[in-house]
Amino acid sequence: MAQTLLKVTGLQVAYGGIQAVKGVEFEVREGELVSLIGSNGAGKTTTMKAITGTLPLAGGDIEFLGKSIKGQGPWDLVKQGLVMVPEGRGVFTRMTITENLLMGAYIRNDKAAIAQDIEKMFTIFPRLRERKDQLAGTMSGGEQQMLAMGRALMSQP
């Protein structure tokens, strides 16, 4: 049986006393691809923000690789390899494409490996290589989504 990577149990999130997410439960095992699907306002983004430490939990627990991550902040979770690709474009528009990719590797200290990983991102997303020194704000929406995915992958989730 594949290892459980993420386990969400009884997740609850509230905004100013209003219950935005109540009782969400699921597991993600190694090798699985999971989507959160629902109507506008159903709590999909709120759930992801709670998992990645950007929103506090009102109840429940979240385990990553068998350990509770409840109450940990986003940078602590990135260091453990848990990242989220934003629903929107989520790029730093006043930074170059290369600088955006480097932000994904910010927590790592191995410069040689980072250089190899940037080259790998340019292989996966060749359109980014062509414009690597341009500001991310000059990119189309689809290109910005590619960049956001590349930046998330640079953190080696």
Positions of PLM-derived features:
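Conserved ABC ATPase signature
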Residues: 135-139, 143
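ABC ATPase C-loop
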Residues: 152-153
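Helix-to-loop junction immediately C-terminal to a conserved catalytic motif
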Residues: 52
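ABC-type ATPase nucleotide-binding domains, specifically the catalytic core motifs of the NBD
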Residues: 16, 34, 72, 97-116, ...
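Short beta-strand immediately N-terminal to the Walker A/P-loop
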Residues: 34-35, 84
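Conserved ABC transporter NBD signature motif
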Residues: 60-69, 80, 113-118
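Conserved structural motif at the start of ABC-family nucleotide-binding domains
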Residues: 6-8, 21
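The feature captures the beta-strand-to-loop junction immediately N-terminal to the Walker
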Residues: 37-39
